[in-house]
Amino acid sequence: MAHISRTAYANMFGPTTGDRLRLADTELFLEVEKDFTTYGEEVKFGGGKVIRDGMGQSQVVNSECVDVVITNALILDHWGIVKADIGIKDGRIFGIGKAGNPDVQPNVDIVVGPATEVVAGEGKIITAGGVDTHIHFICPQQAEEGLTSGVTTFIGGGTGPVAGTNATTVTPGIWNIHRMLEAVDDLPINVGLFGKGCVSKPEALREQIEAGAMGLKIHEDWGATPAAIHNCLNVADEMDIQIAIHSDTLNEGGFYEETVKAIGDRVIHVFHTEGAGGGHAPDVIKSVGEPNILPASTNPTMPYTINTVDEHLDMLMVCHHLDPSIPEDVAFAESRIRRETIAAEDILHDMGAISVMSSDSQAMGRVGEVIIRTWQCANKMKLQRGILEGDNEHNDNERIKRYVAKYTINPAIAHGISHEVGSVEKGKLADLVLWNPAFFGVKPALVMKSGLVAYAPMGDINAAIPTPQPVHYRPMFACYGKAKFKSSMIFLSQASIEAGVPEKLNLQSQIGEVKGCRNISKKSMIHNSYTPNIELDSQTYEVKADGVPLVCEPATELPMAQRYFLF
């Protein structure tokens, strides 16, 4: 039997079972748990390599082989960290296993044929495209920024750079919803829209859902009253959609307890649970302990650093249409910025008590930094809290799975789209992100939408090869022509699909049906379902989880930052 050293094998085919990789410049290390390929029968493309006629490539016709194969990929997902080939057919993940030619190779379950394109996954980490559930649709250029960061799905609301959208993720009413659906149809990213949920009678809510809203948003700037909350959730239960809420910072319509009473035992997605982004001051963070609340963070407070508090006041004044010359407006802003709850937020994420990460794009948050901020927090917590339960001195696999779930599968589950996106699993859209380990979480090597490359770093177009400087991200073929419609999906409520909205608006993108939003709970949040008893001191803002104070120092230095960016 022939032998090869681990180093030589990793250089040729990528890491295998037991090998370890460092994520970017963090102190996080993954270890490969399983290898689905067959030693000695690996497939690889190139001169003198395996994927050639009669060798790793079979003779079958188009219908019997995959359209795309990603060879020797290291998959990092909530369900595992494994080495495998990934087959893609008709824009969806066909299989995860062993690719090749079954005529001459054993254990092949992904057939490579004349119709198969090859993406080299050797030495790359593959994750599912991110799902950002807190998008203010202030400008369409956010799609490019999000895609080039590794996010492939936007959920939120808005109509452009106007006061309502700068403050709230709401696309209100039939006309606005229809115009925005027609607009986002042209974007190479998956999109779902929130209607306005701040209504105390059901008719205005039903018509928005029937018009194409995939969910509804309750926001204090439109009135987050107990009556609106109760009514909105009634309609959600009736029409199987999710409700997102930014609760009442000023406690004008009621205190935290009144909001919880209005919610009852029904599921709801609470945005920026820490509170700097808005919500009952100072105790909205207690919602982390509710079994029917799906808690989320937005990225401006993540992770807690020496600069976090100072930058927030001015951001808040701009986003919520406040005037620094009005004392009441300044007091409103200051009531939301609390060092103690911001520090506790990091720890709650590490405990798996906050389930989702999102951006709050251009409305205090940064649309291109959801993934970076998630891993910066994971790194900060490892340095400050040590090895997570289930991990060891050799790897951080459990912590890594917990954090990747926050921006992939959990937001997809929360909004009823996990049957389409959110993980690297058979049958789902092939929205995949390839990373060089040294650039993991920072700068993707390839961003694929439905199996076709949407964005990639590309060098001088007039150069003899693709790599000469200047290298920067450019849109690829999934962003052009009719291909962009086949590569992206618009998520709609079941009621709007039945009402024929896609046909009435002549939407050309794929249509995804929102379903299963009302039968979930905090327990549905993978690796992030911990529901501690949260206590908050209203005078000192000290936060306790199950009686233990949640205290950590602000970071003075972060990975995935200046080492990778000039600006």
From Swiss-Prot:
Q: Source gene?
A: ureC
Instruction: Provide the reaction this enzyme catalyses.
Output: urea + 2 H2O + H(+) = hydrogencarbonate + 2 NH4(+)
Q: Which of this chain's residues are annotated to bind Ni(2+) 2?
A: 217, 246, 272
* EC identifiers of the protein: 3.5.1.5
Cofactors needed by this protein, per the record, are: Ni cation
The superkingdom listed in its UniProt entry is Bacteria
Q: What is this protein called?
A: Urease subunit alpha
Q: Where is the Urease domain?
A: 129-567
Q: Which Pfam families match?
A: Amidohydro_1 (PF01979), Urease_alpha (PF00449)
Entry's cofactor comment: Binds 2 nickel ions per subunit.
Q: Does the keyword Cytoplasm apply?
A: yes
Q: Which residues bind Ni(2+) 1?
A: 134, 136, 217, 360
How is this protein organized at the quaternary level? Heterotrimer of UreA (gamma), UreB (beta) and UreC (alpha) subunits. Three heterotrimers associate to form the active enzyme.
> What pathway does this protein act in?
Nitrogen metabolism; urea degradation; CO(2) and NH(3) from urea (urease route): step 1/1
The main place the protein resides is: cytoplasm
Q: A GO CC term?
A: cytoplasm
- Family annotation (CDD domains): Urease_alpha (cd00375)
Residues binding substrate: 219
Residues carrying N6-carboxylysine: 217
Q: State the family named in the UniProt similarity comment for this chain.
A: Belongs to the metallo-dependent hydrolases superfamily. Urease alpha subunit family.
Q: Active site annotated at which positions? A: 320
- Location of the protein in the cell: Cytoplasm
Biological process, per Gene Ontology: urea catabolic process
